[in-house]
A protein has these predicted regions:
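Zinc-dependent metallopeptidase catalytic helix centered on the HExxH motif
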Residues: 1-25
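C-terminal, non-catalytic "cap/extension" segments appended to globular domains
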Residues: 1-4, 10, 30, 34, ...
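Long, K/E/R/D-enriched contiguous segments that form extended
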Residues: 20-31, 39
Length: 169
């Protein structure tokens, strides 16, 4: 869609949609929630008890760690963990962030390499559930055992934000 945009206003709008509807929720929000969930599961694995207040404290600490000094954490933000009860049926939120990271890498490879990368992606999809996520991603040419795909995705998000600023002039 972005390639077919004819005005800077259209391009800015589309870049804004990429950030707000795709990457912020599915990459950032789910990444934060996955990190939080991992911290809670550490307590469970250690057979430690916890209360709703403990869960709120852990969520607030997660937000503070993720955003640092750049974002003011409003009172009540620590209660966000309560809004999606289905997240606690297995490790759920990280799949959004991981999937979007893999998809961003594959998209980048298709743009750079063309058909060979697209063919790898189709072969990876055809694997279905015959391999674990690491194996399927590897078949697509993405090594999720390193931080490179994550860093590349963050770099892509930065580029889209730069484009929003560029099209705002």
């Amino acid at each position: 869609f972005l390639e077919k945009a004819t005005t800077d206003q259209e391009r800015r709008y589309l870049c804004g949609q990429i950030i707000s509807r795709t990457y912020f929720h599915n990459f950032v929000t789910h990444f934060i929630e996955g990190y939080y969930q991992r911290e809670v599961y550490k307590l469970i694995d250690a057979k430690e008890g916890f209360t709703a207040d403990d869960l709120s404290r852990i969520f607030k600490e997660t937000l503070q760690k993720f955003w640092g000094e750049d974002v003011e954490i409003n009172e009540g933000s620590e209660l966000t963990w309560m809004r999606q009860p289905h997240y606690y049926m297995g490790l759920y939120p990280y799949t959004y962030s991981a999937g979007l990271t893999i998809g961003t890498q594959v998209s980048k490879m298709i743009v750079e390499e063309g058909k060979p990368a697209a063919d790898r992606w189709l072969k990876a999809l055809a694997l279905g559930s015959t391999q674990d996520s690491v194996g399927i991603a590897k078949a697509a040419g993405v090594d999720i055992t390193t931080d490179k795909p994550l860093k590349d995705t963050i770099e892509y998000i930065g580029k889209v934000i730069d484009d929003i600023e560029k099209y705002d002039k």
